[in-house]
Amino acid sequence: MTIVAKATDNNTKTQIRKILVPIDGSECSLNAARYAIKIAKDENADLFCIHVIASVPYGYTSSPSAIDQYFKDIEEKAQSWFGKVRDMAKNEGIPELKTETFADVKSVIESIIDYATSRDVDLIVIGTRGRTGLKRFLMGSVANGVVQHAHCSVLLVR
């Protein structure tokens, strides 16, 4: 677990009122959700869970029906992931979880940052697979991008 906290003007504790956890169905993202739920419970904070569909893969651009099916498939998967997170939250006594799946022409990183900024989120809790070296360079890192550009504190969970 890594915490990247934004500096405050004084030494007072920053209140966490809104927490965002982006998920992609991986075990890393579900682990991040577990941490986010515990923090939300301890801080009595609102919890937002999102899944971003960045773009349609090249092979799906051949027909409108294929594109529609692609989005339906992703939405079904996301709802399944949200269900898991919702169950974890209920088990911790958090009755309400705000969830959203959306497609965006921007990168996943930009979409997460924009979502967090527009909702004045205080903490982003995001899973990281812990890639290093060439794999990280070639594949990029959503978590790293979020850390670099977030307006708020970020908790990385492995």
Residues of each region from the PLM?
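Gly/Ser-rich helix-loop-strand patches that form or flank binding pockets
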Residues: 1-9, 38, 117-158
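Structural beta-alpha unit
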Residues: 1-14, 87-124
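Small/aliphatic-rich secondary-structure junction motif
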Residues: 10-66, 91-92
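Aromatic/hydrophobic pocket-lining residues that form π-stacking "cages" and hydrophobic walls in ligand
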Residues: 36, 85, 112, 146
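General small-molecule cofactor/ligand-binding pocket signal
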Residues: 50, 98-102, 155
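A short acidic, glycine-rich active-site loop
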Residues: 67-80
